[in-house]
Swiss-Prot record:
HAMAP family: Ribosomal_bL21. This protein binds to 23S rRNA in the presence of protein L20. The gene is rplU. Belongs to the bacterial ribosomal protein bL21 family. Part of the 50S ribosomal subunit. Contacts protein L20. The keyword Translocase does not apply. GO terms for cellular component: cytoplasm; ribonucleoprotein complex; ribosome. This is Large ribosomal subunit protein bL21. Keywords: Ribonucleoprotein, Ribosomal protein, RNA-binding, rRNA-binding. One of its GO terms (biological process) is translation.
Length: 103
């Protein structure tokens, strides 16, 4: 069984037992959270789409860790003008383990 969930403005296809990194969710480590924005639920050949959400469906997950992604380097340069600018960005994430899919 799998589900398509929406969190942090992105969509993820998840199955029970998977781990995934999503945009930061303010929760403690080992806390159980419920993701209610389920867009689709499928098992084998059958799939159920929501309009836009599947009514009564939810995904239970456990917070495994909180962290930061690797740095994305930004470099701006203007040729012949001796203008160079360095920058970087590290995005926060929450790692989840999917425990159950309720449809």
């Amino acid at each position: 069984m799998y589900a398509v969930i929406k969190t942090g403005g992105k969509q993820y296809k998840v199955a029970v037992g998977e781990k995934l990194k999503v945009e930061q969710i303010p929760a403690d480590i080992d806390a159980e959270i419920t993701l209610d924005q389920v867009l689709a639920v499928g098992e084998g050949e059958s799939i159920k789409f929501g309009t836009p959400l599947v009514s009564g469906a939810s995904v239970k997950a456990t917070v495994v860790s909180q962290g930061r992604h690797k740095k994305v380097t930004i470099f701006k340069m203007r040729r012949r003008k001796h203008y160079q600018k360095h920058g970087g960005h590290r995005q926060n994430y929450t790692e989840l383990r999917i425990d159950a899919i309720n449809a």
